[in-house]
């Protein structure tokens, strides 16, 4: 089922799926380890602090955080600070990481997507399609079974702040196990989600919901319809 699958849309924080993929790949290739640490630069901290209004894992500027914790902060808490810290650790600068993201997107066949940063900030230079994001999600699920469970973690605590995973599907009894939500004022509430029932996996991409509740309702409705169709 597809509607406007190739129409451009803002990925918002679903961008972080690709950020995570690049980190997973670096770990698999031996260029990075989960126990390695990354510094939290002033830039990373400022994009995730309360004043910025962005999502944050609340990593302190100047601190060192393990890659394992940054990944949890990235995909569970949707931390912009985690995304920037990982980008700087892998590529040196955000700009270099964005170039790496676009190279990787092309390698994965995401031909209609373009990324400007690791955390999903708005703007015309940050654009994807639903089809491309579904392709990315399927790749991550298939290629990194050892890392995919990060996306299904229910909560994450850092600096004394406990945050729930924002994926509404995870609390529904429909077999959901990932992937990532996104939201920007100009593009609404979005979700890349996945669930598995009776050995059948479905991947869902939706965007433009007006509220969190609408996003949750539509996501559930579409997955339930999909599984019912699979069973026919």
Please provide the spans of the model-predicted regions:
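Penicillin-recognizing serine hydrolase domain
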Residues: 62, 93-232
């Amino acid at each position: 089922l597809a509607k406007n699958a190739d129409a451009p849309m803002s990925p918002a924080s679903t961008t972080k799926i690709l950020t995570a993929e690049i980190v997973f790949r670096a770990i698999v290739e031996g260029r990075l380890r989960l126990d390695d640490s990354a510094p939290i630069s002033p830039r990373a901290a400022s994009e995730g602090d309360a004043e910025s209004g962005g999502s944050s894992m609340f990593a302190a500027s100047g601190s060192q955080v393990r890659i394992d914790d940054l990944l949890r902060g990235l995909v569970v808490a949707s931390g912009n600070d985690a995304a920037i810290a990982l980008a700087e650790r892998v590529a040196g600068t955000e700009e270099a990481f964005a170039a790496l993201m676009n190279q990787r997107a092309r390698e994965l066949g995401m031909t209609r997507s373009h990324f400007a940063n690791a955390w999903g900030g708005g703007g015309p230079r940050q654009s994807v399609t639903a089809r491309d994001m579904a392709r990315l999600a399927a790749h991550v699920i298939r290629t990194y079974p050892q890392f995919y469970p990060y996306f299904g973690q229910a909560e994450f605590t850092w600096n004394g702040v406990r945050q729930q995973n924002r994926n509404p599907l995870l609390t529904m009894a429909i077999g959901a196990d990932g992937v990532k939500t996104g939201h920007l004022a100009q593009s609404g509430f979005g979700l890349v989600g996945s669930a598995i029932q009776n050995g059948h996996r479905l991947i869902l991409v939706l965007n433009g919901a007006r509220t969190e509740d609408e996003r949750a309702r539509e996501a559930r409705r579409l997955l339930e319809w999909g599984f019912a169709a699979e069973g026919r």
